[in-house]
Amino acid sequence: MSADELNIQQYKKMTETPIPKLILGLAVPTILSMLITSIYNLADTFFVGQISTSASGAVGIVSSLMAIIQALGFTLGHGSGTIISRSLGSRNTEAATRFASTSFFTALAVGVVLAVVGLATLPSFMMLLGSTETILPHACAYARPILIAAPLMISSLVMNNILRYEGKANFAMIGLVTGGVLNIVLDPIFMFGLGLGTAGAGIATALSQSISFCILLSMFLRGKTVSQFRIAAVTREAREFGMILVGGAPSFGRQGLQSIGGMLLNIAARSYGDAAVAGMSIVSRIFMFIISVAIGVGQGLQPVAAFNYGARKFRRVRQAAIFTMGAAFCMLVVLVSLCWVNSDALIRLFRDDPEVTAVALPAFHYQCLAILLQPVIVVANMTFQSVGKAGRATFLACCRQGVFFIPLILILPRTLGLVGVETCQPIADVFTFIVSLPFLLAFLNQLSRMDDAEKARSAS
């Protein structure tokens, strides 16, 4: 099938399929991908936790490194993806290929820079991310293979997002799920079978992500996509690079500040010992799993919102946002209820240490309550990013981990002690919800007015 035929087929799918069927069709593969990714993160936490409390703390330190990798990948992936989707919505396939090529080759180059700088300064880098002296050997051993694979990991995130924004979430899922399952299988083999310890966890992650990269790249090389990767198509215009960076700024704010927030959380927790760092790390990994459902549904919304906004079908954008909020909320209620009932056993599964549980359990309960606000936060952020409202999207993306969390993590532990460490994230979530809701409601009303104006223009 030619690129033009693929584009026509995809246009009909994205602009005519009923919204619930379309969103769920795109969201289910994305949710599965994110759940598998979260499961292999939890698997790392579980297997590393069998070594020692200090090793378990290293998972939290390397999580901040992973957040940096994700920030770079999502910035380029979301930044180009929203433009690609809107370009396909307006039937401009040449622009789609240009932005896809630019983001992919830029990701490879950025990954090489991160790998070189990170490996050259590894011990200092890990201390900067919040490591203690006892955690440091584990953190360095874990991080080294991941840094080596950073160029492929960042590029994989770009390809994953381009596939999703083209409406091909199933293809994106194949690459991510394969990598995730492989990671889970390889963890115990490298860590215990080969006796490599925390270094084995890093090698398993790096190897599985490299295989995921190869699978995702094959989708583009085999002509499964409308946009393609060509060196000659990489833009020479600073304005178009700027468009990618502006479009990806919300993702950079979200993921970059998550890295900074994770670093500050580790620093605040390490005042209370390795058990506190390990406990907060376990809670963060569990909630990464839970929140991946809301984010997965939200990522199902993104190509629908971007494509239909580009096609000037504003009512479908509004319907998609409202449906996504309802679906995400229902899924979170079920998950949170199950986790609350089994919270103690869930935490002990990852590290059966009374000191770790004493820190993790209250933090877990606080976050269970606040996470039910996430559907509004996620939909507001992703809707604005998808339709090209980068300013609003960036501001809202920076609220959760930046505008609110960073001041709270600097202030509350000084005034409330360990309770301040445990309550920072849920309090930041409440404030972010309060800010996001009026932004979203105003835009939904604006979409209704834009749809009425579009109908009047078509009728005249």
Residues of each region from the PLM?
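Residue-level signal for short hydrophobic patches within transmembrane helices
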Residues: 16, 20-39, 43, 65-72, ...
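Transmembrane alpha-helix boundary and packing residues in multipass membrane permease domains
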Residues: 30, 34, 46, 63, ...
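Transmembrane helical elements of multi-pass membrane transporters/channels
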Residues: 25-44, 145, 179, 208-212, ...
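Helix-terminus/linker motif at the lipid-water interface of multi-pass membrane proteins
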Residues: 35, 39-57, 126-133, 189-196, ...
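Small-residue-rich hydrophobic transmembrane alpha-helices
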Residues: 56-116, 153-172, 279-343, 374-396
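Hydrophobic transmembrane alpha-helices of multi-pass small-molecule transporters
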Residues: 68-71, 183-188, 213-217, 289-292, ...
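Short alpha-helical transmembrane segments in multi-pass integral membrane proteins
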Residues: 1-27, 84-151, 193-249, 305-370, ...
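Short runs within selected transmembrane alpha-helices of multi-pass transporters and secretion channels
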Residues: 77, 146-164, 172-180, 201-214, ...
